[in-house]
Amino acid sequence: MTASAAETVCRVMVFARAPGEAKTRLIPALGTAGAAALHRRLVMHCVRAARDSRLGPVELWCAPDTGDPFFLECERRLGASLHPQGEGDLGARMQRAFESALALSPRAILVGSDIPALSAQYLRDSDRALRRGDDAVIGPAEDGGYVLIGLSRCDAALFRKIPWGGSEVLAETRRRIAALAWRATELPALWDVDRPEDLERLPEEMRESFMPAASGTGARNESGTPRNRGGLP
């Protein structure tokens, strides 16, 4: 890529863990296999949205490493390049990803991999904010975190000593951005899938990836006995 071409693109990074290492809070409702199947479906959805945005290279940042067969499938089917998240807490890994991306492109967007409502247009709206001169763009999550962060510059203050996984992540990130005197935009809030009650909001096509067809028999756990469906109709 030439220098002029690099200036026109925004890298989109998707953070994901290997199936079986994510969405463990859904196991009581879905079973181990069901939770892994839903996780795969959500990751593919987010990578596909990144690809369809046509903003620039799509990078799948993988944990614990890039060797899981599912990640290799994403690379083969969707054209995402694979990158190891590496060591450290979530903030350290995000900072590392942004430093890598912004060394190659003037703008970068990072999203999670459990966002059913993520769309190519949402990503394009994020990049539009950065192209018009914002230093940061945030896609809030309904639970007090965020589903997306986009940057045109990187500062470690955004990522260090953040209470990741708590309800104050977004508020603390806003404070950090204000302290840096950065210009920032917030997009409409989206929801992510963390708890069994979130399953009720999934589109039907995503439910089909991990739930049996509606046959009146109900969901069953891995021993074949009926299990609680976590409120799903």
Residue ranges of each PLM-predicted region?
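N-terminal nucleotide-binding beta1-loop-alpha1 segment
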Residues: 1-26
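Conserved alpha/beta core of the MobA/IspD/sugar-nucleotide pyrophosphorylase nucleotidyltransferase superfamily
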Residues: 5, 168-233
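Short glycine-enriched, charge-decorated loop/helix-capping segments at active-site entrances
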Residues: 26-34
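A short, N-terminal amphipathic alpha-helix
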Residues: 39-56
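Acidic donor-binding segment of Leloir-type glycosyltransferases
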Residues: 56-80
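Short phosphate-binding loop-to-helix
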Residues: 71-107, 166-169
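Catalytic metal- and UDP-sugar-binding loop of GT-A-like glycosyltransferases, i.e.
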Residues: 111
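Conserved donor-nucleotide/metal-binding helix-loop-beta segment in metal-dependent transferases, i.e.
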Residues: 118-143
